[in-house]
């Protein structure tokens, strides 16, 4: 895969660093280097993004990692690795930011589950707006939450796929829900994907946890 033209839209360097390190943990340095080469990201071999919140990790780079995982490991294997990378990014980088940092406080812990989500999901969306160029909105419905990404880094530049591909975002969302809820797992399903031709990437979160 050749290098894609840069988007000019960015995630913080730290998000890129954690994504790359989480993949190295699973597949080893040689496996990671193969993914980086395949995605046109050889400049990150032995030269990871810096550990800071500067906007320096281009959306095309995250998209290239996702598509390279699929290409090398197949849709199922790539999906699992991308979900893991997304979860790791939340656990290592995001849960201590802003309103999310208060999720372990007693005053928050004793709130009813849906109240936690009403506070936590918009707070999570706001963090992306503050730290990155990702634009996210949240809408509450009767039995579900709708999490919408209007400029999506996970599938930036991709077209012509027949199924949603934004598994890094799915993993981020799953782990954020687990953190905010105090340990529950929720069903998260990507229902729309820009790479499929949809105008946005949309994720449906069932309000009732599965565990």
How would you label these PLM feature ranges?
Residues 2-18, 129-170, 178-211:
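Short terminal or interdomain "cap/linker" segment that borders an active site or interface and mediates
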Residues 2-84, 89-92:
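N-terminal low-complexity or simple alpha-helical regulatory segments
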Residues 31-42, 79-85, 106-111, 182-195:
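Short alpha-helical "patches" and their helix-cap loops
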Residues 54-165, 178, 192:
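Amphipathic interaction/junction segments at domain boundaries or subunit interfaces
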């Amino acid at each position: 895969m050749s290098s894609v033209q840069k988007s000019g839209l960015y995630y913080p360097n730290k998000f890129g660093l954690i994504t790359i390190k989480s993949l190295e943990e699973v597949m080893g340095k040689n496996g990671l280097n193969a993914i980086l080469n395949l995605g046109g990201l050889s400049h990150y071999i032995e030269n990871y993004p810096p550990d800071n919140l500067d906007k320096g990790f281009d959306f095309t780079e995250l998209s290239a990692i996702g598509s390279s995982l699929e290409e090398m490991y197949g849709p199922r294997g790539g999906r699992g690795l991308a979900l893991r990378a997304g979860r790791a990014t939340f656990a290592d980088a995001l849960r201590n930011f802003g309103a999310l940092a208060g999720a372990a406080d007693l005053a928050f812990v004793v709130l009813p589950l849906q109240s936690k989500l009403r506070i936590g999901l918009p707070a999570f969306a706001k963090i992306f707006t503050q730290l990155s160029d990702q634009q996210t909105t949240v809408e509450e419905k009767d039995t579900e939450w709708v999490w919408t990404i209007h400029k999506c880094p996970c599938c930036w530049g991709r077209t012509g796929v027949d199924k949603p591909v934004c598994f890094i975002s799915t993993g981020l969302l799953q782990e954020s829900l687990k953190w905010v809820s105090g340990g529950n797992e929720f069903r998260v399903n990507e229902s729309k994907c820009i790479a499929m031709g949809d105008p946005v990437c949309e994720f449906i979160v069932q309000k009732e946890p599965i565990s």
